[in-house]
A protein has these predicted regions:
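Actinobacteria-biased recognition of intrinsically disordered, low-complexity terminal regions
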Residues: 1-39, 266-279
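Hydrophobic alpha-helical transmembrane segments
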Residues: 20-29, 74-83, 106-113, 147-150, ...
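Membrane-interfacial loop-to-transmembrane alpha-helix junctions, especially the N-terminal start
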Residues: 34-40, 92-109, 160-163, 219-228
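Alpha-helical transmembrane segments of multi-pass integral membrane proteins
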Residues: 38-50, 106-118, 131-145, 156-181, ...
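Membrane interfacial helix motifs at helix-loop boundaries and amphipathic/re-entrant anchors
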Residues: 49-79, 114-130, 174-201, 235-253
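Canonical alpha-helical transmembrane segments
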Residues: 81-99, 139-146, 206-215
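Membrane-water interface at the C-terminal end of transmembrane alpha helices
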Residues: 137-159, 256-276
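C-terminal transmembrane-bundle signature of multipass membrane proteins
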Residues: 201-279
Length: 279
């Protein structure tokens, strides 16, 4: 039996490598792009409005006593967590490219955080807000031509991010309870503007995004979002509120998560067993 020398010298890529190799999808039709544009406007209107408005107020010193909330729950950090997934979904779908593996889990985690927080933290209009978040997200997911399959999304516990996720849950749980109490009992301007609800919302989102990264390798980039937001909350509290042990711990935890996520991103490879790299 003879063997073709050229074929024997050329390695055949494994199924795992082929699955992880980006490939173009069919270009979206005009109708699909109209659906993407309309759903994109709806899903990004609030995070961009609140996020950019809060950023301008923060930079110009408008309402200086609200600077911490402008940075965190009222606008900037919450807006980033809210918009990151939808922006990635829209850009990839518009270009006819596969959506990044982290984009849909990041958006779904934020939507879940919205619904969970609104279910037990009081505040004027918070349940309507959560419904808007969920409905606009569903419209976007309907418009996206090829969402990642749920099968295989959970592929084991990450040995580094899993303990960090548990620590994050233990760190943020009492903070969420405290913010709920403030929203329910205070009658100051912060309570009227539901800032305490916003902070609970942000905290729940950070934890859920970190848990998502801990159980799904393809969604690992959500840990960068969670770590960056946690670091922002901690440092922002130390600089704009007053130094407390909790803010120190939040900054340290967020920095650890961010560092671990970035390091894993740089060293990630396709595992021989068929695991996926973070995308």
């Amino acid at each position: 039996m003879t063997t073709n020398a050229a074929s024997s010298a050329t390695p055949i890529p494994s199924d795992a490598v082929l699955r992880d190799r980006p490939s173009d999808l069919a270009p979206p039709s005009r109708r699909r792009r109209v659906a993407l544009a309309l759903s994109g406007v709806l899903v990004l209107a609030l995070p961009l409005l609140w996020g950019l408005g809060s950023l301008v107020a923060l930079l110009t010193g408008h309402e200086a006593d609200h600077r911490f909330h402008q940075l965190t729950g009222e606008g900037v950090l919450l807006g980033v967590l809210w918009a990151a997934g939808p922006v990635a979904l829209l850009l990839a779908s518009w270009r006819g490219r596969p959506v990044p593996g982290w984009a849909w889990p990041a958006h779904a985690g934020f939507v879940l955080a919205s619904v969970v927080t609104a279910s037990f933290v009081p505040g004027d209009g918070v349940r309507v807000l959560a419904a808007i978040v969920a409905v606009t997200a569903a419209l976007l997911w309907w418009a996206v031509p090829a969402l990642p399959r749920l099968r295989g999304l959970v592929d084991g516990l990450d040995p580094v991010l899993s303990p960090l996720a548990l620590l994050g849950a233990a760190l943020y749980a009492p903070y969420v309870v405290a913010q709920r109490h403030l929203q329910a009992t205070r009658h100051d301007e912060h309570a009227e503007m539901t800032h305490y609800f916003d902070m609970a919302w942000l905290a729940v989102a950070i934890v859920l995004l970190l848990v998502t990264a801990a159980i799904s390798r393809q969604a690992g980039r959500t840990a960068i979002l969670a770590g960056g937001a946690g670091l922002g909350v901690g440092v922002g509290g130390l600089l704009l509120v007053h130094p407390t042990t909790w803010f120190v711990l939040a900054a340290l935890h967020g920095g650890a998560v961010l560092g671990a996520a970035v390091l894993q991103r740089r060293t990630s490879v396709v595992r021989p067993s068929g695991g996926r790299t973070s995308v």
